[in-house]
């Protein structure tokens, strides 16, 4: 028994086997991504930064029904509706989302009858102050304009499952 232990210690078999194990994993393809330069695929149902969408003619989609405000469990959405227009429709005068309160549940997107409020593909929207995470209507519309192509593609891919 002692001779066997001495032989293992002399030949450093454990060290050598550990070295070969490390070398085997060293030359295998990496399992991780180099994040800032490589990004993994996002699901069509990914819920990121909020955006307000427009119709192709440039008119905003939101009809001020306030369903998203009512269904929000975090009470992060505040909407004020303007007076009815001549054609009987309403538009919002104020649409604010407090992203600090938001839990990204997606209920607002599910409740919207005209797909006006959506959670887009952007997940890189860090801020230095809390005030930057208070989104007003202009910021939400700008997000919608910036991400419209990706948002439309995600909604089209998810449409059969709705």
UniProtKB/Swiss-Prot annotation:
Assigned keywords, A-Z: 4Fe-4S, Cell inner membrane, Cell membrane, Iron, Iron-sulfur, Membrane, Metal-binding, NAD, Quinone, Repeat, Translocase, Ubiquinone
Coiled-coil segments: none
Principal place of residence: membrane
Record's bilayer topology term: Peripheral membrane protein
Binding site for [4Fe-4S] cluster 1: 62, 65, 68, 112
GO molecular function: 4 iron, 4 sulfur cluster binding; iron ion binding; NADH:ubiquinone reductase (non-electrogenic) activity; quinone binding
PROSITE patterns noted in UniProt: 4FE4S_FER_1, 4FE4S_FER_2
The protein's assembly and partners: NDH-1 is composed of 14 different subunits. Subunits NuoA, H, J, K, L, M, N constitute the membrane sector of the complex.
Function: NDH-1 shuttles electrons from NADH, via FMN and iron-sulfur (Fe-S) centers, to quinones in the respiratory chain. The immediate electron acceptor for the enzyme in this species is believed to be ubiquinone. Couples the redox reaction to proton translocation (for every two electrons transferred, four hydrogen ions are translocated across the cytoplasmic membrane), and thus conserves the redox energy in a proton gradient.
Family per record: Belongs to the complex I 23 kDa subunit family.
UniProt name for this protein: NADH-quinone oxidoreductase subunit I
Protein's gene: nuoI
């Amino acid at each position: 028994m002692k001779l066997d232990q001495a032989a293992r210690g002399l030949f450093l078999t454990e060290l050598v086997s550990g070295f070969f194990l490390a070398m085997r994993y060293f030359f295998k393809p990496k399992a991780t991504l180099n994040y800032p330069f490589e990004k993994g695929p996002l699901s069509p149902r990914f819920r990121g930064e909020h955006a307000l969408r427009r119709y192709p003619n440039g008119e905003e989609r939101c009809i001020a029904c306030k369903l998203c405000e009512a269904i929000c469990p975090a009470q992060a959405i505040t909407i004020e509706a303007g007076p009815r227009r001549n054609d009987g429709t309403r538009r919002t005068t104020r649409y604010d989302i407090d992203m600090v309160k938001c839990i990204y549940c997606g209920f607002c997107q599910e409740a919207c009858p005209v797909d006006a409020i959506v959670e887009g593909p952007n997940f890189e929207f860090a801020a230095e102050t809390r005030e930057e995470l208070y989104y007003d209507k202009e910021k939400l519309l700008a997000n919608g304009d910036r991400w419209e192509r990706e948002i439309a593609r995600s909604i089209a891919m998810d449409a059969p499952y709705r």
